[in-house]
């Protein structure tokens, strides 16, 4: 079972960039592992650090600003997560501490992978995202409330509605990844297997 996601209130960091691809999110040299942990240290490695070893922080990159330390909601521009279809991208984001990414649009594969890893991708219109960038930049350290049950983002004195399809919303609310979904039908699977001829088992 994955962690349930119903509502999250967190610090917002504004990454004012469009077409952020998966190689920027987690560069290919860090993809040797197949477990989900440890990738957060290399999130946006080529942007966060001035050296290849990731030891010299780039003071001009927004994730390194003191006011955004501990951020758990990432605000971005259109086509977030484009490029190659590596599942390591949501792994890196969640391992760093992000729970939500808000953007006008996402690459399809990244969008699906995010739900599989309990990272909530929230689509809002370009105009709404513009408003949120203005709000965050004027109020560094502001927190948003993201309510998956009600499908709303509360930011400042405004509320923004978003839509998640019923199946994915059900899975997130109940902490169900693909394994969890399968285990819900464990008895039926066992019954089916027991009915198979011995030579097929």
Curated annotation (Swiss-Prot):
Its EC number is 4.2.1.33. The keyword Secreted does not apply. InterPro entries: 3-IsopropMal_deHydase_ssu, Aconitase/3IPM_dehydase_swvl, AconitaseA/IPMdHydase_ssu_swvl, IPMI_Swivel, LeuD. It is an enzyme of class 4 (lyase). It catalyses: (2R,3S)-3-isopropylmalate = (2S)-2-isopropylmalate. The keyword Amino-acid biosynthesis applies. Pathway: Amino-acid biosynthesis; L-leucine biosynthesis; L-leucine from 3-methyl-2-oxobutanoate: step 2/4. GO terms for molecular function: 3-isopropylmalate dehydratase activity. Keywords: Amino-acid biosynthesis, Branched-chain amino acid biosynthesis, Leucine biosynthesis, Lyase. One of its GO terms (cellular component) is 3-isopropylmalate dehydratase complex. GO terms for biological process: L-leucine biosynthetic process. Heterodimer of LeuC and LeuD. HAMAP family: LeuD_type1. PANTHER family: 3-ISOPROPYLMALATE DEHYDRATASE SMALL SUBUNIT (PTHR43345:SF5), 3-ISOPROPYLMALATE DEHYDRATASE SMALL SUBUNIT 2-RELATED-RELATED (PTHR43345). Catalyzes the isomerization between 2-isopropylmalate and 3-isopropylmalate, via the formation of 2-isopropylmaleate. Belongs to the LeuD family. LeuD type 1 subfamily. This is 3-isopropylmalate dehydratase small subunit. It comes from Salmonella paratyphi A (strain AKU_12601). The lineage of its organism: Bacteria, Pseudomonadati, Pseudomonadota, Gammaproteobacteria, Enterobacterales.
